């Protein structure tokens, strides 16, 4: 289970710990103050640095406060949106409504889905719709902002760079560190 309590700062280099401590504290504050004006967040950085862990902790805290939260991987999100659009699958159409309307949406691993013109358009539509309706989104990605612009579009880049609070995760892969220590 991913929580704020088991987010271990010891895996970050001493130079990075104060910054990561602030990221955790800001994330806890985000949960406490979650509401109509909450900002969207963009967690960027290499794999294994805690982006998913921290976004799951935020999602759980916001859900426990009674808000509707959806947590979905980018590949699953795109598969479901495509099913709803092209096969008119009822469950996928309902999924789309929830994704566009939930109080907080967390998209994990943006950039790992098969990127096509369709997925580029869907990412833009989803990001734009949620911004226009004041619905916050947290996006985790291994891509940097320039890679996002190249992969999706300048319109997606502009919205993420200009309207999301970007948080860059740095350090050594925590999963690999844990494996070296004998954790699974």
Named regions from a protein language model:
Residues 1-18, 167, 178-184:
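A short, basic N-terminal segment
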Residues 6-41:
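Pre-Walker A (pre-P-loop) alpha-helix and adjacent loop at the N terminus of AAA/AAA+ ATPase modules
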Residues 14-24, 60-101:
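Short glycine-rich substrate-engagement loop in P-loop NTPases that contacts/grips substrate
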Residues 39-43, 105-107, 137:
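Generic beta-sheet signal
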Residues 67-68, 101-105, 133-139:
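Loop/turn-to-beta-strand initiation segments
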